[in-house]
Amino acid sequence: MGALTSRQHAGVEEVDIPSNSVYRYPPKSGSYFASHFIMGGEKFDCTHPEGYLFGENSDLNFLGNRPVSFPYAAPPPHEPVKTLRSLINIRKDTLRLVKCAEEVKSHGEEAGKAKVHYNVEFTFDTDARVAITIYYQATEEFQNGIASYIPKDNSLQSETVHYKRGVCQQFCLPSHTVDPSEWAEEELGFDLDREVYPLVVHAVVDEGDEYFGHCHVLLGTFEKHSDGTFCVKPLKQKQVWDGVTYLLQEDYGIENKSNTQDFKVAEDDVRDNSAECVVCLSDVRDTLILPCRHCASCNVHCADTLRYQANNCPICRLPFRALLQIRAMRKKLGPLSPSSFNPIISSQTSDSEEHSSSENIPAGYEVVSLLEALNGPLTSSPAVPPLHVLGDGHLSGMLPSYGSDGHLPPVRTLSPLDHLSDCNSQGLKLNKSLSKSISQNSSVLHEEEDERSCSESDTQLSQRLSAQHPEEGPDVTPESENLTLSSSGAVDQSSCTGTPLSSTISSPEDPASSSLAQSVMSMASSQISTDTVSSMSGSYIAPGTEEEGEAPPSPRAASRAPSEEEETPAESPDSNFAGLPAGEQDAEGNDIMEEEDRSPVQEDGQRTCAFLGMECDNNNDFDVASVKALDNKLCSEVCLPGTWQHDAAIINRHNTQRRRLSPSSLEDPEEDRPCVWDPLAV
């Protein structure tokens, strides 16, 4: 350190006290800093000569002009550095001047020339009893390690006010006023040569000898506005502990921004409320960039990236000279209790603990979040409430029924239809909806379970067969007939085929555990109108034998000839469907097979779907080869609805076995030949 190199061999008592210029920057001679510095028990080389790592070099003049002895012993090499406990904190951003309610008038002074006096107010926090005094135009002196401030006039100080411990206390002394207009202009600011501070707020701990000499000092200056009014601005803050003066510097980026404040933030004021590293956006910030003091990165990988690949701070883009990691530790207290456990802190510190490159954690200590160590536990946002029972007619995760009965459909695991709506005066309206949407957890079941469920479904439906038919005129067609399919995606008219409906695949556990999102998808995108059904092409093929496996379809197909209904559009509103002779159709134009092939009818006389128990060709079918053909194109696998296929085509399909189909309910008892079912007429 130039002329000061002899200080390392001499005691503190031998330093020349009158030479005040020794600890002033810039020094009159020599260098202020040495070639290295010691921090955290380790020695580091100074890459930038005469560079103050924690701020501007001029800030060193606030530390004092007298050398002091360090009162603490050096910590062991493997012990963490102990932090000093600050019992008092004055919030410098709350320091302000408040005009008095009544203007003070001097004797013999005119009313128009009345002077304006101000009160000094600020907010502070204290963990001990404190005595606060305000000084004006004062100088600083240290006697026996205790800081004292002496104003140039005894009238330039307030009375001492005592406060108890508390948080967010307000200092307001109406009996004490100040008039900065009485001072000269140079006295409003701080002059290093004069060493006179315009404003000093001195808060001393008042709790006996244990904390004797511990104080907090806030230095401020005055400014005059163009309209003649004055304001006060904070200059620096200091802590005096055991005779050593510590200059307080602000670190940016580690404040607890989630705390509620008295003022409202404007909508256009964009603020960074996150505590993650600005480089990787995953770990918690714990590395301070010096000298700009931006806590913006983590020490996992980003600190090394800044050291070897970048030279500027990622926030202010100024060049930096050092990186300081601040890792907060505490003694292990055992497992955290539920009351002190914070999910935000745990999630933020887990990655840093696992990926930390230097695990120099002393025995008996654990790492805590820096935000928690400085600001206390973070406020966790309330968790998203789970779905509850909505009411009598609603279940969690399911949609209410839209049928005419107004009740929820019975939850079935075997039948693909929920219920049938009542008949109205205009015609028969069927509303067929699946009992449940296929959830992701139950989209694939074993083959044996599918065949067993379909067999049981066919057995139950065969018991409800009846010869009753709705009495309706041959020309009466229902106005609308919506067929609700359970599909995982939107229905595309060009890709939809008329493959028969399969039995509903439902979750074997809770009948009300289906996904709400898929239920909404099924109800919103699977309502097929009459026009959609009429534009769909399909061939409803009954299964063949019970042998396993699927044979490839025959390349031969019966040619499709136009029927009378297609040639005469006036006879039917829908010309896309071919009909059977009059004796083989019902009043609606649907196919009627003999005895076993008739459409099952429920107890109230309403027809159910004629192809109940068949499977639907949608996105949930994996192993079923669907037959696709447009209405205006001939497909090799499509034949005329309601007609028998040629024997040559039957031979190749004789061994075809569709999964999840029970052939007993759809075969012709007299001939072992599959028939083509007509699409649902509308």
Curated annotation (Swiss-Prot):
GO molecular function: ubiquitin protein ligase activity; zinc ion binding
UniProt EC number: 2.3.2.27
Domain of life, per lineage: Eukaryota
Entries under Gene3D superfamilies matching the protein: Zinc/RING finger domain, C3HC4 (zinc finger)
Catalytic reactions on record: S-ubiquitinyl-[E2 ubiquitin-conjugating enzyme]-L-cysteine + [acceptor protein]-L-lysine = [E2 ubiquitin-conjugating enzyme]-L-cysteine + N(6)-ubiquitinyl-[acceptor protein]-L-lysine
One of the record's GO cellular component terms: cytoplasm
Phosphoserine modified-residue sites: 662, 664-665
Biased composition (Acidic residues): 585-597
Compartments where found: Cytoplasm
Tissue: Predominantly expressed in the brain.
Residue ranges, annotated region (Disordered): 440-604, 655-682
Motif (D-box 1): 330-333
Pfam family, one: zf-C3HC4_3
Keyword line: Cytoplasm, Lipoprotein, Metal-binding, Myristate, Phosphoprotein, Transferase, Ubl conjugation pathway, Zinc, Zinc-finger
Function according to Swiss-Prot or TrEMBL: E3 ubiquitin ligase that ubiquitinates APBB1 for its degradation by the proteasome and thus prevents apoptosis and promotes survival of neurons. Has a dual role in neurons as it is also required for dendrite growth and maintenance for which its ligase activity is not critical. May act as a scaffold molecule to regulate this process. Acts as a downstream effector of the interconnected PI3K and MAPK signaling pathways and thus participates in the regulation of the cell cycle.
Domain notes: The D-box motifs play a key role in RNF157 stabilization.
Subunit structure: Interacts with APBB1. Interacts with CHD1; CHD1-binding controls RNF157 stability. Also interacts with ATRN, MEGF8, TECR, MSI2, PLRG1, BYSL, MTERF3, PSMA1, MRPS18B, PRPF4, FASTKD2, SLC25A1, SMU1, CNOT9, MRPS2, MAGT1, FXR2, EMD, PSMD8, HDAC1, RAN, HSD17B12, TXNDC5 and MRPL19.
Name of this chain's protein: E3 ubiquitin ligase Rnf157
Provenance organism: Rattus norvegicus
Highest classification ranks of the organism: Eukaryota, Metazoa, Chordata, Craniata, Vertebrata
